[in-house]
Amino acid sequence: MAQRNGMSPRPPPLGRGRGAGGPSGVGSSPPSSCVPMGAPSTAGTGASAAATTTPGHGVHRVEPRGPPGAPPSSGNNSNFWHGPERLLLSQIPVERQALTELEYQAMGAVWRAAFLANSTGRAMRKWSQRDAGTLLPLGRPYGFYARVTPRSQMNGVGATDLRQLSPRDAWIVLVATVVHEVDPAADPTVGDKAGHPEGLCAQDGLYLALGAGFRVFVYDLANNTLILAARDADEWFRHGAGEVVRLYRCNRLGVGTPRATLLPQPALRQTLLRAEEATALGRELRRRWAGTTVALQTPGRRLQPMVLLGAWQELAQYEPFASAPHPASLLTAVRRHLNQRLCCGWLALGAVLPARWLGCAAGPATGTAAGTTSPPAASGTETEAAGGDAPCAIAGAVGSAVPVPPQPYGAAGGGAICVPNADAHAVVGADAAAAAAPTVMVGSTAMAGPAASGTVPRAMLVVLLDELGAVFGYCPLDGHVYPLAAELSHFLRAGVLGALALGRESAPAAEAARRLLPELDREQWERPRWDALHLHPRAALWAREPHGQWEFMFREQRGDPINDPLAFRLSDARTLGLDLTTVMTERQSQLPEKYIGFYQIRKPPWLMEQPPPPSRQTKPDAATMPPPLSAQASVSYALRYDDESWRPLSTVDDHKAWLDLDESHWVLGDSRPDDIKQRRLLKATQRRGAEIDRPMPVVPEECYDQRFTTEGHQVIPLCASEPEDDDEDPTYDELPSRPPQKHKPPDKPPRLCKTGPGPPPLPPKQRHGSTDGKVSAPRQSEHHKRQTRPPRPPPPKFGDRTAAHLSQNMRDMYLDMCTSSGHRPRPPAPPRPKKCQTHAPHHVHH
C-alpha cells in the first residue's frame, strides 16, 4: 500500500470483509449469531443508507439519512428501543469496565451523527435542535439514556456557563437530558409504562454536555458540579458513563440497571437503610453485626469483601497498620486526621479488602442464618448469570453467563462464588423479595481477620459515615479521604466507585469544601489520554479530520482491549506510524517528579534500590513499562486492580503542605449540619489549595515508616535526612568564640564629621522662646570619636595638567575639527528679553 505524505498507510476501508450485509459496525446491525432469538431484525440506526464514494479517498463511506436511532419513516425512539443495539448493550456484565469490539461498534453507530457534528459549538446546538427527542444509550451502565434536548427546554439550567467549571475547554454545549428506566416495584405509579420510552425517569437533574474534541461531561444541576465522563470519542464508546458515581443515586432505578451490593441477610439490609442517624447505626452494628463480611459490588470491578468493624482498634489486624512500628499510635494519628477532615462525628463502617479474600463459608460462628444459602464445598469454578444486567421483558432475552476464575480464600482454599442478585437495585423492596434472593454469607470465621490464614489481609479502603449521612473512604495508600456516596443506599449501588475515578469532578469552592472533593487531576482535564494515539501530534495526517478518526476507530480487526490491551495498543500505534515505547517514555517524562520530604527519614544508600549501570540497562519495552499515569490516576488504578504492592512516589512537600492544628474532638450527634459545612469551608479557605500534611501508613520505598506519639502527633527526628541530590556531605567552618562584652546602655547614633581643616560649623539655631543667645555645642562621646570617618585621600596629581587645562585642550581640539571640515560652530543664541507683565490696576474702594 502506498505511503501518504511519508507516513504510515491508510487503514483498510470500512465495510470490506464482513460479507454482503454492509459496512461493519457503521450503520448495520450486528451479525445474526450475536443477536438473541426473538429480537427484531430492524436496522439499529438511520445510518444504513446507500454507500457513497468520496473523491480522492476511495473509501466506502456511509452517510446517514436521518437522526441516529430512527429511519425517516418512524419515530425517533421506537427504532432504537426495539432494535438489536439496545439488546446487545443490555448484556454487559456489571464487573466489566470496557466494551467488546461488537458492543463498541454498536455504541459508535448510534452516536455517529453527534461525532461528525462535533466541530463547533454552533454545529452542536443545531444538531440538538434537529434531533430533539432522540434516545441515545450511555453504554455503561445499562438502562441509562441521553434524550436529546435543546437548551431552551432544560428546566433550571438558564444561562449557566459551564466553562467556568472547565476553563480548558473552548466551548461546552448542553445537548441532552439523562434519563433511566424505572423499577415498577420501587415506583408503582409507573404502571404499564415501565417498558416504554415514556416511562423513563428524568428527575435526577442530570444533563449531558459535549465539548471540543468530543469531550463528554455530565452536569449535576442540584450540586452545580461538572463531571468529566470521557476525554474523547474513543473513551466514550469504550467505557460509556459507567465511571460517573452520580448516576447510581436514584432509588427508582429499574430492573435492567446493574445490581446493587449483595447483603447476607435482610435484617442487615434493614439496619443499613432504615437507620435514622449514625449513632443508632453504630450501636446496632457493634451489637449485632461486628465481624460480618459483605460482598461489596462496585461497577467496573470484581466483587470484594467488606468486613464490618465493631471498633476502630480492629484495624490493627490489617495491613498496613499491622506492620507499623506502633500500630496504636498510627491509628490514633489517623483518627486525629479524620476528625480534622470531616469536622464532625463519624462512624467506621468497615474495611474493604482485595477480591482474593472473598470466599464462602457455612455462615457466622453461630451457624447458617436465615435467608442465606450455603454452596457446596467442592464447587470448583462457578458461573454467574447476568442477574440485574438482563434486558427488560420487552426484549425477551436473558443475559449470558460470565465465567469467574477460582480464587483462594482463607485457610480452606475454595472457589470464589459470585451469586446472581434477583432483585437487582431494589434495595428498598419488600422483605419477602429480599429473603427470596439467593445470597451468600461470608462468615467471620472464614476470612474476617488475619488469624484465619497465614497472611495478613490488606485494607484497601476504610469506609466511614459522617453525621450528614454521606459515605467517605479513607485510603491508607496515600492517606487521603475521598467521598464515595451521598447516602448509604447510594453506597450499596455504587460501591467504592468514587475512589476509582479521582479528580474528575469540578465544583465551586464552597461545594467542593462541603463534599470534600479531591483536587482536580490536571493531567485528565487539560491533556488528552496517553493511549489516545489518534490525537497524538505525530500521528498520520489522515487521522486529524473527523472522518479519518472515525475510520481509524472502526477499522476492521482493530482488536479487543479486554483480553490483550498491549496488542490492542500496538495495533493502534502501528496503524498511525508511532512507536508505543517512545510515546510512553515521553509521557512519563512529562509527569511531575517525586519529592522526598524533609521530615521523612530516608534509608541509607546501601538499603535503597540502586539502578543498574548504563552498560547493563536494557532498552525499555512497552510490555514492561508502567502506564504513564498521574498521582491520582495511579491510586485509582491500584484500587481497581487490587495492587497490594503499590507505594506512593512522593511524600508530603514540607514547604508547601498545610498543617492543621485543630485538636477538636467531635461526638456523634453534637453538631448541626450548618456548623459542619462552615467548618469545612473555613479550613478549605485557610488551606488555599495546598497539600494536606497527613499521616501516611504506606510510605515510599526509600523512606522509613513515620513515628507518632500516643496522642497522634508525628515525631520529627533531630537529625533530618540529607538532600536527595547531594552526594557529598555538607562541611561547616568552625566560627571562633565571641569574647564577652560589657553591657553598655544604648546611645544616640553617632554623627559622622570630618577631621582636619575645613569651614567652621554653623552655629545652631536659637530655639524659640529662649532668652540666652549662647548655646553649648553637643558633647561627643568616646564611642563617637572612635567611629569617626577617616579623612579622604588627596586627588591624584597630573603634573602641570589640571582639570581646567584638560578641558581647555579638549575645547581646542573640537574647534580645530570643526574648522578643518569647513563647518563653523554656530554661535550661541542671545538671551531672550523677558516680557514685562502688565499688572492689573488696583481697585480703590471708597
From Swiss-Prot:
GO terms for cellular component: host cell cytoplasm; host cell nucleus; virion component. One of its GO terms (molecular function) is protein serine/threonine kinase inhibitor activity. Residues 832-846 have a biased composition (Basic residues). Its main location: virion. Residues 722-732 have a biased composition (Acidic residues). It comes from the Viruses. It is found in: Virion; Host cytoplasm; Host nucleus. Keywords: Early protein, Host cytoplasm, Host nucleus, Host-virus interaction, Inhibition of host innate immune response by virus, Inhibition of host interferon signaling pathway by virus, Inhibition of host PKR by virus, Interferon antiviral system evasion, Transcription, Viral immunoevasion, Virion. Pfam families: US22. Interacts (via N-terminus) with the viral DNA polymerase accessory subunit UL44. Interacts (via C-terminus) with host EIF2AK2/PKR. This is Protein IRS1.
